[in-house]
Regions:
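Fe(II)/2-oxoglutarate oxygenase catalytic core
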Residues: 1-110, 114-144
Length: 144
């Protein structure tokens, strides 16, 4: 899928993306720079993912805040993706996948990120750190 100019520059502005775990770079696969400082966060997310999807294996956690959610295909996924949506007073933000709109608020969704998908427009997103305890009570929805 060819990226438009908007898609290539979508991370600029006020969006915030933090990636921890194993990352690919031109120097090969390596542990991300922020990984060691994010261990408490990684432990909580790992606990939630293992509880909801015991067979799911992953190497990287990407946390997005104010992400524009354009239509895209995840570039380096080997298998499925899990999307955890956490926030307060969220309106919108559903996942568009395979021609369907899938509600995401307070949910964990498993889907194939190698297929086109996007986050629909949303408003009022909360900072993640004080919401981590809410992750332990998140529900699941599995995309077809």
């Amino acid at each position: 899928m060819e990226k438009t100019r908007f898609q290539r520059t979508a991370y600029h502005g006020k969006s915030n993306n933090v990636v921890v775990g194993l990352n690919w770079s031109f120097q090969g696969t390596r542990l991300g720079a922020r990984t060691m400082s994010a261990l408490p966060y990684i432990r909580v997310v790992t606990q939630v993912v293992q509880k909801l999807f015991p067979e799911f294996a992953y190497t990287t956690i990407s946390t997005n805040r104010d992400f524009p959610g354009y239509l895209h295909i995840d570039g380096k996924n080997v298998g499925p993706s899990v999307m955890l949506t956490v926030g307060e007073a969220i309106t919108g933000g559903e996942l568009w996948y395979d021609g369907k709109v899938i509600p995401t608020a307070g949910m964990a969704i498993c889907f194939d990120g190698n297929n086109p998908h996007m986050t629909l427009p949303y408003s009022t997103w909360s900072q993640v750190p004080h919401l981590l305890p809410k992750l332990l009570h998140i529900g699941t929805r599995v995309g077809d």
